């Protein structure tokens, strides 16, 4: 969802500075596409379910689809007219459309493309343009135990090839910036520039208010938004709720809601859920909710959980806060950056202590009310517009620098002729 929100904010905020391209087997490796094409792809990723039932099947890979739509950040001075890619359907190859000063930036996660390094290298060689990338995390490299066999070597090949090609590297958190710098240094990879952190938005900048799925009532459930996979630590939430149901009156225990599709390496959890009849119907799974349903789930929950072992950012945490909902969150990696002082932090490996935190929150309505009051009075969500502005403000100096060099040094590397409009 993050990438789609940034797409929309870039177009709404900077329509004269942004265009879109996608992978294609053409000279330069990319062709221009319209914003309507991008928006249609984003909208097609929402597969909501009105009912609550055990989820099955594979999780939708948002970034694998959206990462094929790259950002082409264009300074105003490099354009004689508005970028045609905002209105046209499918346009020319990037070699025909690009001009000196343009900068290609991928904001998604292109690791699915085994040829991505070669594609970007060929693009840079053919155009002389600069390339920037937003790194969301390096978790497959740093914690390969959370992924299926073979994922880490593939990810490492792509990231090791693409980082040296990046003229600018953006990250979503200080934790990710540290991971990128540390890993690159350990691998003796020379970075074109130090990673720069951009603020990440929260909430839904294009609100479409849905209704709660059947079986859920306002204030009577705790919400855990995430793909159900081993790294996200749904198993700890399951253990906490199992103990709550043993030690508290059943009517005092809110329903636990997992909002997300089934991922990987959670076979034991799935069997436990089935064996307990979804904790005797105290556990519900909303499979891959669309944005409208997700907004309703946040809006009407009592509080949220996010117990992940390792994150690059932690969007469900900041989303929760943006809806005025307290989050019981993991204390690891970037998550405290997303939650600041407004979360109740727990150790994802210490279920006993995490249980006490959740139990106290459930048993002390005044405590929850006080925390929500502090959140309401002191928390200001970061908007997706702020994210878009930060990207443009960070990258436009890179593009302007490229344009200046092209004007004063029309060498073959700048490939000026390829970019002049007829």
Model-derived features: where do they sit?
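Carbohydrate transferase catalytic cores enriched for Leloir-type hexosyltransferases
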Residues: 1-422
């Amino acid at each position: 969802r993050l990438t789609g929100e940034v797409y929309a904010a870039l177009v709404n905020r900077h329509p004269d500075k942004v265009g879109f391209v996608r992978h294609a087997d053409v000279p330069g490796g990319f062709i221009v596409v319209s914003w309507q094409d991008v928006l249609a792809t984003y909208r097609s990723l929402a597969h909501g379910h009105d009912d609550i039932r055990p989820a099955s099947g594979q999780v939708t890979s948002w970034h694998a689809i959206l990462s094929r739509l790259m950002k082409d950040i264009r300074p105003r001075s490099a354009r004689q007219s508005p970028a045609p890619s905002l209105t046209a359907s499918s346009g020319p190859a990037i070699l025909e459309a690009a001009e000196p000063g343009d900068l290609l930036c991928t904001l998604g996660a292109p690791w699915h493309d085994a040829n991505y390094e070669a594609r970007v290298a060929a693009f840079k060689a053919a155009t002389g343009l600069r390339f920037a990338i937003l790194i969301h995390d390096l978790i497959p490299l740093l914690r390969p135990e959370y992924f299926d066999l073979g994922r880490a070597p593939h990810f490492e090949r792509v990231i090791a090839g693409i980082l040296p090609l990046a003229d600018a590297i953006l990250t979503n958190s200080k934790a990710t910036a540290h991971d990128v710098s540390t890993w690159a240094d350990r691998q003796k990879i020379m970075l074109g520039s130090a990673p720069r952190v951009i603020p990440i938005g929260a909430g839904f900048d294009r609100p479409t208010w849905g209704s709660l799925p059947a079986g859920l009532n306002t204030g009577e459930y705790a919400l855990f938004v995430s793909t159900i996979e081993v790294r996200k630590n749904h198993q700890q939430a399951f253990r906490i709720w199992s103990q709550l149901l043993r030690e508290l009156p059943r009517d005092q225990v809110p329903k636990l809601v997992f909002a997300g599709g089934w991922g990987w390496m959670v076979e034991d959890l799935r069997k436990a859920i089935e064996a307990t009849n979804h904790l005797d119907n105290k556990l519900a799974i909303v499979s891959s909710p669309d944005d409208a349903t997700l907004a309703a789930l946040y809006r009407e929950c009592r509080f949220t959980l996010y117990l992940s072992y390792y994150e690059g950012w932690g969007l469900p945490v900041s989303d929760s806060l943006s809806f005025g909902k307290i989050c019981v969150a993991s204390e690891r990696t970037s998550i405290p950056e997303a939650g600041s002082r407004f979360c109740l932090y727990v150790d994802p490996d210490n279920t006993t202590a995490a249980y006490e935190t959740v139990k106290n929150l459930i048993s002390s309505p005044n405590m929850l009310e006080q925390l929500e009051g502090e959140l309401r009075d002191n928390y200001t969500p970061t908007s997706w517009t702020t994210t878009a502005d930060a990207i443009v403000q960070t990258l436009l100096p890179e593009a302007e620098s490229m344009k200046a060099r092209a004007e004063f040094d029309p060498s073959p590397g700048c490939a000026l002729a390829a970019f002049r409009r007829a």
